[in-house]
Amino acid sequence: MGDRPAVRISAAITPVQQMLASGTGAVLTSLFVTPLDVVKIRLQAQQTPLFQAIAAESRPWFRVTRPSKWKCFLYCNGLMDHVYVCQNMSSCSNLYKTSTHFSGTLDAFVKITHNEGLRSLWSGLPPTLVMAVPATVIYFTCYDQLRDFLCYSMGYHGDHIPLIAGGLARLGAVSVISPLELVRTKMQSRRLQYSELMVCIRSSVAQDGWLSLWRGWGPTVLRDVPFSALYWFNYELVKAQLCEHYRTPQASFTISFTAGAVSGAIAAVLTLPFDVVKTRRQIQLGEMEALGAVSMKKPSSTWNMMRNIWIDMGYKGLFAGFLPRVIKVAPACAVMISTYEFGKTFFQERNLHQARCGL
């Protein structure tokens, strides 16, 4: 890259076309990654039983008061992590069945497909896409718009531009989606109707203020913003080097796929400690939403939690799950960015063709 301005592919397409390209990429990425995560969850389910807990009536709108079985776990569709709260195995039975014993990942794929049908590998996908697709559309469109603004309107060029644009774009997407994810967790854990939702939100805001809607925002930002900054920095760098190596002015699908996988793997490894902390925080917040805030102590701060992990397990604790994260993140990034770039190229060629026909 150096001080060379990048080819402005996005200049020939509209923001709406960027949104369509990123939305398509988001759906395809989710279709590809979701089976991997469903299998992971099912393998975890046979090792970790649901825990017993008493649901405390700590809010006027929190109606569950009887002893109940709860389990909070993370579900990822390749774009976002979502907290799922299981209540007596009923609210997420398709995701968390444990009737069949699995000896490993491949065995789980075969048995789930054979016993429950192919569709069961995509259990839980539609509800998560409701937020994952808008978040991805905001994120990728904002990145292109910010990068082009810095490069072509402000006149800045250099390797730091993707770093800045990627971090700011992710910060904006996380800030918009974070309250919606908290609301979704409340609705799921408490079986709230839409008519009850505003009462729930007003009660939460009255007690803890408007910032309570962004509970869990900090750990998400600490993981996702550095990840995005590193991802776009490495992606643009690797893509430019591959284009130079193959002497092509515009990245092909293969080049975008390769650059996406490499940059995704690098960013995943470097931000793994924040991912470990964020996972723990999300589980704690999910349990708090399910059981009532009064019944559980407030979760530790991000830095305290990271320090405790370091004291208890050392660097191995902070880099736990290294291989599974890379295996999941690298292909997800590759599929998403290559589909997005392909979509942008398609719209660019379409717009150029229409412009020529209009002359």
UniProtKB/Swiss-Prot annotation:
Function: Mitochondrial transporter required for glutathione import into mitochondria. Glutathione, which plays key roles in oxidative metabolism, is produced exclusively in the cytosol and is imported in many organelles. Mitochondrial glutathione is required for the activity and stability of proteins containing iron-sulfur clusters, as well as erythropoiesis. Involved in the early steps of heme biosynthesis.
Taxonomic lineage of the native organism: Eukaryota, Metazoa, Chordata, Craniata, Vertebrata
A Pfam family assignment: Mito_carr
Catalytic activity: glutathione(in) = glutathione(out)
GO cellular component: mitochondrial inner membrane; mitochondrion
GO molecular function, one term: metallochaperone activity
Classification via InterPro entries: Mit_carrier, Mitochondrial_sb/sol_carrier, Mt_carrier_dom_sf, Mtm1-like
Residues the record lists as binding [2Fe-2S] cluster: 72, 76, 86, 92
Side Mitochondrial intermembrane, residues: 1-18, 141-162, 234-253, 338-359
Subcellular localization(s) per the UniProt record: Mitochondrion inner membrane
Mitochondrial matrix side: 40-119, 184-212, 275-316
Domain of life: Eukaryota
An annotated GO BP: glutathione import into mitochondrion
Residue stretches spanning the membrane: 19-39, 120-140, 163-183, 213-233, 254-274, 317-337
Solcar repeats: 13-149, 157-241, 251-346
SUPFAM superfamilies, alphabetized: Mitochondrial carrier (SSF103506)
Post-translational modification: Cleaved and degraded by AFG3L2; degradation by AFG3L2 is regulated by the ability of SLC25A39 to bind iron-sulfur. In absence of mitochondrial glutathione, SLC25A39 binds iron-sulfur, preventing cleavage and degradation by AFG3L2. The presence of mitochondrial glutathione prevents iron-sulfur-binding to SLC25A39, promoting cleavage and degradation by AFG3L2.
Protein name from the UniProt record: Mitochondrial glutathione transporter SLC25A39
Family recorded in the similarity comment: Belongs to the mitochondrial carrier (TC 2.A.29) family.
Activity regulation as described: The activity of SLC25A39 is regulated by levels of mitochondrial glutathione via its ability to bind [2Fe-2S] iron-sulfur cluster. Upon physiological levels of mitochondrial glutathione, glutathione prevents iron-sulfur-binding to SLC25A39 promoting cleavage and degradation by AFG3L2. Upon depletion of mitochondrial glutathione, SLC25A39 binds iron-sulfur, preventing cleavage and degradation by AFG3L2.
Principal subcellular localisation of the protein: mitochondrion
Gene name of the record: slc25a39
Effect of a null allele: Morpholino knockdown of the protein results in profound anemia without affecting erythroid specification. No porphyric phenotype detected.
Keyword annotations from UniProtKB, A to Z: 2Fe-2S, Heme biosynthesis, Iron, Iron-sulfur, Membrane, Metal-binding, Mitochondrion, Mitochondrion inner membrane, Repeat, Transmembrane, Transmembrane helix, Transport
